[in-house]
Amino acid sequence: MKTDVAQAKRQIRAEKIAWRDAQPAAERQEKSLAVWKRFFEIPEVGQARTIMLYHSIGSEVSTRTAIQQVLSTGKRLALPRVDSAAKVIHAHEVNDLSQLERSSFGILEPSSTAPILDPGEIDAV
């Protein structure tokens, strides 16, 4: 039974990713900008001192504009980094996109030398 559910979930996920990948790049960019416009209009986000995001990959909603906006406003930016050995994810403070490096999964994440933030320091995710 669990195998059937897992297989169905994999199939649905693959179909949705294929659909998303098929969308024109200009349309994906337009929709990404609309998402972040609404995000930054949320009062709690405006008041936040530290915001946690992730670096998007492929055809996901692009987070690059949001990351740059957080950095340009002087707020603290937290991005996740996977510690595979410890099987944990830590939030690291990033001050510049040059602090990112490719993980073994091909995802851009903070370098291991970027400071780890306490989860209590993060005001908005």
Which sequence ranges carry the predicted segments?
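N-terminal active-site beta-alpha-beta segment that forms phosphate/nucleotide-binding
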Residues: K2-D123
